[in-house]
Design a protein with these regions (language model features):
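Conserved SAM-binding motif I beta-strand of class I
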Residues: 67-72
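C-terminal catalytic and target-recognition region of SAM-dependent MTase-like enzymes
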Residues: 152-206
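S-adenosyl-L-methionine
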Residues: 73-119
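S-adenosylmethionine
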Residues: 102-174
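Conserved alpha-helix/loop element of class I SAM-dependent methyltransferases that forms part
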Residues: 28-44
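Non-catalytic substrate-recognition/targeting regions of SAM-dependent transferases
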Residues: 1-27, 35
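Conserved class I S-adenosyl-L-methionine
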Residues: 43-52
Length: 206
């Protein structure tokens, strides 16, 4: 990767590069969720959906996860994530990378299950891959089949047009056994005058 540099968050090192489409390689507003993952991943098998450069995966391994399975349709993003793990000397055998479009098939993710933690952090609307309003239901239905009893789910929505109630309704309908635990607070580094337009992260127990 050209012109790359390194950044550090809570002792973990990340490869960064000048913004491309507003992305430097790490979504900074998701820092509270990375902290939560690290605090709750011990001895868990973690499924990281729409993993991008695997920031949540780094947090999970640092927090004692047994295994993390990273899924994203972008192979370059997952290769970047693999470099991030190597930068932190994480054991390669504990981390899997699946460059695959979930909207076409779930079998690659299913073969590594069941899981005891899942992070779902999809793009709001990415042409050719995912539309949150139309396809979040499919993700929740499939994820519900992959989880062990007493597992944890971090369910994210990063849309200025869809609110907390949308996410609550989706989970209630398509993942009915999920029990709401909390909304994670937004990062103080990214104050939002209209909270419904900011990143929304609901924590559930299945």
């Amino acid at each position: 990767m050209e012109e790359r540099t390194e950044g550090t968050e809570e002792g973990l090192r990340y490869i960064l590069q000048p913004p491309r489409n507003q992305n430097v390689g790490l979504f900074l507003d998701a820092a509270p969720l990375r902290s939560w993952v690290r605090q709750n991943a011990n001895n868990r098998r973690v499924l990281n959906l729409f993993a991008y450069t695997c920031g949540f995966s780094l947090a999970a391994i640092a927090g004692g996860a047994v295994q993390v399975v990273n899924n994203d349709m972008s192979r370059p993003a997952l290769d970047w994530g693999k470099e991030n793990h190597a930068l932190n000397d994480h054991p390669p055998r504990q981390v899997a990378y699946l460059p695959h479009n979930l909207m076409k098939s779930w079998w690659k993710v299913r073969q590594f299950g069941p899981y005891s933690m899942v992070i779902i952090d999809p793009p709001t609307n990415q042409r050719g891959s995912f539309n949150a309003e139309k396809q979040y239901s499919t993700v929740l239905k499939q994820v519900a089949k992959l989880m062990e009893p007493d597992s944890l789910a971090a369910i994210c929505l990063n849309s200025p047009f869809l609110d907390h109630q949308f996410l609550e309704n989706q989970v209630a309908r398509w993942m009915p056994k999920a029990r709401f635990q909390q909304w994670l607070p937004n990062s103080p580094d990214f104050p939002e005058a209209e909270p419904e337009r900011a990143l929304k992260v609901g924590i559930y127990r299945l």
